[in-house]
A protein has these predicted regions:
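Long amphipathic alpha-helical segments with strong coiled-coil/leucine-zipper propensity
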Residues: 105-213
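Basic amphipathic recognition helices
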Residues: 202-226, 230, 242
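Solvent-exposed flexible segments
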Residues: 154-158, 170, 174-185, 217, ...
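Short linear sequence motifs
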Residues: 59-62, 72, 89, 204, ...
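Alpha-helical oligomerization segments
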Residues: 222-291
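Residue-level detector of solvent-exposed, low-hydrophobicity positions
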Residues: 22, 73-76, 86, 103, ...
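Extended, helix-rich scaffolding/adaptor regions
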Residues: 1-154
């Protein structure tokens, strides 16, 4: 799992604490890292024993009140090693959401994904209303003399710019995977970008549903996928477990979003950020409560 040069804003301060499965038998013996990641912190006890913890919590993404990550990491380890029982998969995903502080905080901290979701609605909703040529002009994406997949690459860059943070990176990866639905339509290089004008009229809803499914899955793998790598019997077993998780999340999310007003998701909709965050919360709630 890539952590980047700094601690991922997706994860709480205690994420790297020992979880009972650590490769280091004494994780408490590791020196505490300063923000620059190079020097151990001096052991100067604070008058307020919770002061340091409070400071770290405030530096987390959107400052949600995270709970311990140990149950999430332990249950994912059990599931990956085949010791989780019949409910191993559901428990692993449920504890993962709980470790984000519950469905509300899991949704609230997914800011990059929320922005990208709205951007998908803006772009493909615009294609339905105005046509792809006009929408590309609106987004300053050149067409002349370019292959469709080159144009699609620009569309991805507009909807989810090159990431600066791990949060952005997961959101972008989810978009790239979601856009495979569109890329596949241009496997025949003779096809023109105007093909987008003839897509299913519900393409915006289809892509938004796929994006939310994919983001939730990719975020889980980013956060606790290392448990699968370490505890699965081999690479084939790990791939099977990841596939099971992906299908489980996709089923729950698609069912949750089935009758939701996805077609109105765009920047012109009043309180659209609240609307989209609410959709993420509902999806996370279903996963948290194992509904």
């Amino acid at each position: 799992m890539y952590g980047g040069p700094n601690r991922s804003p997706l994860l709480p301060p205690d994420f790297n604490d020992g979880d009972g499965n650590s490769d280091n038998p004494n994780p408490q013996d590791k020196p505490e890292q300063q923000p620059d990641g190079n020097k151990p912190a001096e052991n100067n006890p604070s008058e307020n024993p919770n002061e340091n913890e409070s400071t770290l919590q405030e530096s987390s993404s959107n400052n949600p009140q995270y709970t311990s990550w140990r149950p999430a990491k332990n249950s994912m380890s059990k599931y990956a090693s085949g010791k989780g029982g019949s409910n191993g998969k559901r428990n692993a995903v449920s504890n993962y959401v709980k470790s984000h502080g519950g469905s509300q905080n899991a949704a609230k901290s997914a800011k990059s994904a929320i922005r990208t979701t709205i951007s998908i609605g803006d772009f493909f909703g615009g294609v339905k209303q105005k046509g792809i040529t006009q929408v590309l002009k609106d987004f300053n994406i050149p067409i002349e003399g370019r292959k469709p997949k080159e144009i699609l690459n620009d569309i991805v860059n507009v909807l989810a710019p090159t990431p600066d943070l791990n949060d952005d990176s997961v959101a972008r990866k989810a978009l790239v995977n979601t856009m495979s639905i569109i890329y596949e339509k241009f496997d025949d290089e003779k096809k023109d970008i105007s093909l987008l004008d003839s897509l299913d009229s519900d393409i915006s809803k289809i892509l938004i549903t796929k994006y939310i499914e994919t983001f939730i899955y990719e975020r889980l793998i980013h956060d606790v996928g290392s448990r699968i790598e370490k505890k699965a019997e081999n690479s084939n077993a790990a791939a099977k477990i990841e596939k099971e998780l992906k299908e489980y999340i996709e089923t729950k999310v698609s069912t949750t979003l089935k009758d939701k007003p996805l077609s109105i998701i765009n920047s012109e909709t009043k309180n659209v950020n609240v609307l989209v965050e609410g959709l993420y919360q509902q999806c996370y709630k279903v996963l948290e409560d194992q509904l």
